[in-house]
């Protein structure tokens, strides 16, 4: 049996449930420590299949999947994975250059990015939007006093963040609009998506957004701007036009069977073709 104290920070370990401790012990024994990124994806897929999840039905099976301890493993994994930390630092550096007074990380999970940002911008108000944050995440964030967990967005923000969120939800256009409504005009939304079949919980009915996301955001009124690692910054220009974004999304879905025939690495061409066909 693996000694969790050698792999899990004490502040986190004392907040884990018996089920979480048992699962982590099993995983660490199976992989002789932390699994690789690909093995974490494998573990997620195992649970998706074990719960019998259907990507077309967001029901209690999917809810149970997202409550499984594999997501605690994912949060801990990111805290020590070099590539993930590189992304986090790059996001933080970009955010710090924007100097927002108030920002929120929507679906910020374990709060790692928010803690980085809170330390880089000690005078900023940093919120992690999660209706049911894990006690361990709250405990770890306590050392960064300007970071707090909130159940929902409220009021107006200078900057919003959503990383690896929209590929998991059935209506990403609607959720993007709902959240962007809290962004001040001229504010920026840092979004990083993966509309690709990396893991089973990336909904396949959304894969057309790999090429159609930027055109849809532009139609909505969120102008695509600077690329930041695997994400992009979108600036709010004014009122949000959700029907226009949905039209682009629907057109992108129809174009997708042809777009996906492009060679790998041709995302820019796919986006350009989608924008041309769906303008």
Language-model segment annotations:
Residues 161:
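A conserved beta-strand element that flanks and buttresses the S-adenosyl-L-methionine
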Residues 2-155, 176, 192, 199-278:
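Conserved N-terminal segment of class I S-adenosyl-L-methionine
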Residues 164-168:
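Short catalytic micro-motifs in class I SAM-dependent methyltransferases
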Residues 174-185:
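A short glycine-rich, Lys/Arg-flanked "PGG" loop and its adjoining helix->strand segment in the class I
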Residues 186-194:
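Conserved beta-strand signature within the Rossmann-like core of class I S-adenosyl-L-methionine
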